[in-house]
Curated annotation (Swiss-Prot):
<keyword id="KW-0436">Ligase</keyword>
<keyword id="KW-0658">Purine biosynthesis</keyword>
<comment type="function">
    <text>Catalyzes the ATP- and formate-dependent formylation of 5-aminoimidazole-4-carboxamide-1-beta-d-ribofuranosyl 5'-monophosphate (AICAR) to 5-formaminoimidazole-4-carboxamide-1-beta-d-ribofuranosyl 5'-monophosphate (FAICAR) in the absence of folates.</text>
</comment>
<feature type="binding site">
    <location>
        <position position="229"/>
    </location>
    <ligand>
        <name>5-amino-1-(5-phospho-beta-D-ribosyl)imidazole-4-carboxamide</name>
    </ligand>
</feature>
<dbReference type="InterPro" id="IPR013815">
    <property type="entry name" value="ATP_grasp_subdomain_1"/>
</dbReference>
<keyword id="KW-0464">Manganese</keyword>
<feature type="binding site">
    <location>
        <position position="9"/>
    </location>
    <ligand>
        <name>5-amino-1-(5-phospho-beta-D-ribosyl)imidazole-4-carboxamide</name>
    </ligand>
</feature>
<dbReference type="GO" id="GO:0005524">
    <property type="term" value="F:ATP binding"/>
</dbReference>
<dbReference type="InterPro" id="IPR023656">
    <property type="entry name" value="IMP_biosynth_PurP"/>
</dbReference>
<dbReference type="GO" id="GO:0000287">
    <property type="term" value="F:magnesium ion binding"/>
</dbReference>
<keyword id="KW-0547">Nucleotide-binding</keyword>
<feature type="binding site">
    <location>
        <begin position="123"/>
        <end position="183"/>
    </location>
    <ligand>
        <name>ATP</name>
    </ligand>
</feature>
<feature type="binding site">
    <location>
        <position position="281"/>
    </location>
    <ligand>
        <name>Mg(2+)</name>
    </ligand>
</feature>
<dbReference type="Pfam" id="PF06973">
    <property type="entry name" value="DUF1297"/>
</dbReference>
<keyword id="KW-0460">Magnesium</keyword>
<comment type="similarity">
    <text>Belongs to the phosphohexose mutase family.</text>
</comment>
<keyword id="KW-0479">Metal-binding</keyword>
């Protein structure tokens, strides 16, 4: 069987893991990036495209294959084109529209009894410091902090002038929770009927993470463009509540977006000084922070006692499904 993915985000990890699990591998790659990916011997097949429509054709042109989505898929290819993919997709493709809509994303978290930041529908209602986010997986680009409603309205006006948004309804305006970011990575296994923690990361963002190096008298507006990731482990006392969140999330998605979460997902959180975990967003697919753990994380070793990246864990789940003749339970 062929496992393939789009060249970006976590594609190297996905295909490296697939090869470790004995699969033939394939990458759908823009011709401008082909040379880079040719450097890696674990990629068996190259499906080179020059347009997004051609990328979908390349995916659909494969046989006996499973396509593995990642966090850049919708952003690069677009929801309408992704809906035309006929090749089986690992995970729940019905979650894609929910991930692309910030209001729906927050609704799933709230239905899961997960603690979330206060949300403001209208800039006029802002009465505290907030962070304003653009829709979709833009890697933090365009996000800004507003200390009051005047700053929020001014920031929105700048986004409109730059053509980044058409109307305010596209944005999510959230209370800015004071604490440290921790991104809790999970994997739900339909084959083993369990939620596994696969790692934790912190996003390394420019320029907010560089401002601390400046003298205090130099003022600069923070931006939140993700440039990399840093590994983390959490105090063990935090983990039970985070696991409860993850299990609640899986149960909710089964009811609201059947067949529910399958495979990797991430609860993107702030941990406060009282050790409360506040989840401000989720990712329903593999996140780039898993690239830190190509040989496994401190948590994946506790389950498998062998090197187990999330890419390899995806391959392992597909292998288990094939062995049990239940591939339809991990693909949609």
């Amino acid at each position: 069987m062929l496992l393939l993915t789009l060249a970006s985000h976590s594609s190297l990890q996905i295909l490296h893991g697939a090869k470790r699990e004995g699969f033939e591998t394939g990458i759908v790659v823009n011709g401008k990036r082909e040379g880079f990916y040719r450097r890696f011997s674990f990629i068996d097949n190259f499906y080179v495209y020059s347009s997004e429509d051609e990328a979908v054709e390349k995916i659909n042109g494969t046989s006996n294959s499973v396509f593995v989505p990642h966090g850049s898929l919708i952003e690069y290819i677009g929801m309408e084109r992704v809906s035309r993919i006929r090749t089986p997709i690992f995970g729940n493709r019905n979650l894609f529209p929910w991930e692309s809509n910030q209001s729906k994303k927050m609704k799933l978290l709230e239905l899961s009894n997960i603690k979330t930041p206060m949300k403001f529908e209208n800039p006029e209602d802002v009465d505290r410091m907030v962070i304003v986010k653009l829709p979709g997986a833009k890697g933090g680009r365009g996000y800004f902090i507003g200390r009051n409603k005047q700053e929020v309205k001014e920031g929105i006006r700048r986004l409109q002038e730059k053509g980044l948004i058409n109307n305010v309804e596209e944005l999510i305006i959230q209370e800015y929770v004071i604490g440290i970011p921790m991104y809790f990575q999970f994997f739900y296994s339909p084959m083993l009927q369990r939620v596994e923690m696969t790692g934790i990361d912190i996003r390394y963002e420019t320029n907010v993470d560089g401002l601390r190096r400046l003298p205090s008298d130099i003022k600069a507006e923070p931006t939140f463009v993700v440039a990399g990731n840093i590994p983390a482990v959490a105090r063990e006392s935090i983990l039970p509540s985070v696991y409860e969140y993850a299990e609640n999330f899986v149960k909710t998605t089964k009811n609201v977006v059947p067949p529910g979460a399958i495979g990797p997902f991430c609860l993107e959180s702030i941990v406060t000084d009282t050790l409360d975990v506040v989840v401000f967003e989720f990712s329903g697919r593999i996140v780039a922070g898993t690239n830190l753990y190509v040989d496994g994380s401190p948590y994946s070793w506790l389950y498998w006692d062998e090197p187990m990246s999330v890419g390899r864990r995806i391959g392992r789940e597909i292998n288990l499904a094939i062995q049990k003749n239940r591939l339809n339970e991990v693909t949609t």
